[in-house]
C-alpha cells in the first residue's frame, strides 16, 4: 500500500526545486566522473552536503537510468520505511491498532506526499533522526530493567543512526539530537541543583554540633 502511495508517476513532473536539481546533478556527475567519494557540482567540489543521499541517488540512477524517477526513488523507499517504522513504534508503545491509526493519519497528511515524492535530502534525514531519538529514549527508559547487553545494543543503534544522519545532512543532526538529550536530562539536572542548594541551606545536625 505504501508503495502505491509514493511510487506511481514519480517521474511525471520535471525536477523543479533548487535542491532537487542540484542533488540529482551531483549524482549524475558522480556516475560520469566515477568519483564516488567527493560530491561535486560542475565537476567542482560541493561542500554543502555530505554524500549519503547522493550515493542513494547514484544507485537508483544505475538501476533506472539518469532521470526524474531515479532521482526521486530513494525518497519513495524512505516513505515506505517511514510508515513501517511508525507502525512498529506505535505497536510497541501501545498496540497494533494505535500503530495502524498513526500510519493512516500520517499517510493522510499532505507533507509526506510532497516529501516522499521529491528528490530532496530531508525525508531521509528526518527518518534517521527519528530512529536515533527512539533508540536514545529506549536507552534511557527503564534503565534498571533492561540488561547491559540490550543497553549496549540501544547505545550502538543510537550512535549508528546519528552517524547516518550526519552523513546525510551534516552536523545539524548533532545539534538536534543534542537538544533532545539536553531536554531529556534537564529535569534530572534541576533536581540535583535543588538538592545541593537545600543541603547548603540546611547542613546536617552533626556538623552543627561541632561548630
Give the residues covered by each predicted segment.
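Membrane-integral, polyisoprenol-dependent glycosyltransferases
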Residues: 1-197, 202-211
Amino acid at each position: 500500500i505504501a508503495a502505491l502511495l509514493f511510487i506511481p508517476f514519480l517521474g511525471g513532473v520535471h525536477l523543479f526545486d533548487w535542491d532537487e536539481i542540484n542533488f540529482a546533478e551531483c549524482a549524475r556527475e558522480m556516475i560520469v566522473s566515477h568519483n564516488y567519494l567527493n560530491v561535486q557540482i560542475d565537476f567542482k567540489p560541493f561542500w554543502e552536503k555530505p554524500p549519503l543521499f547522493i550515493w542513494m541517488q547514484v544507485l537508483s540512477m544505475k538501476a533506472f537510468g539518469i532521470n526524474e524517477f531515479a532521482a526521486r526513488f530513494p525518497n519513495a523507499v524512505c516513505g515506505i520505511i517511514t510508515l513501517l517504522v511508525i507502525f512498529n513504534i506505535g505497536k510497541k508503545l501501545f498496540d497494533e491498532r494505535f500503530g495502524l491509526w498513526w500510519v493512516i493519519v500520517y499517510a493522510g497528511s499532505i507533507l509526506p506526499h510532497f516529501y516522499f515524492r521529491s528528490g530532496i535530502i530531508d525525508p531521509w534525514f528526518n527518518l534517521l533522526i527519528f530512529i536515533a531519538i527512539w533508540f536514545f529514549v529506549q536507552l534511557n527508559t527503564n534503565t534498571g530493567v533492561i540488561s547491559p547487553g540490550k543497553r549496549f545494543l540501544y547505545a550502538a543503534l543510537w550512535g549508528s543512526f546519528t552517524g547516518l544522519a550526519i552523513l546525510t545532512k551534516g552536523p545539524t543532526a548533532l545539534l538536534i539530537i543534542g537538544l533532545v538529550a539536553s531536554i531529556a536530562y534537564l529535569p534530572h539536572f534541576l533536581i540535583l541543583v535543588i538538592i545541593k542548594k537545600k543541603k547548603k541551606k540546611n547542613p546536617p545536625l552533626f556538623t552543627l554540633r561541632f561548630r
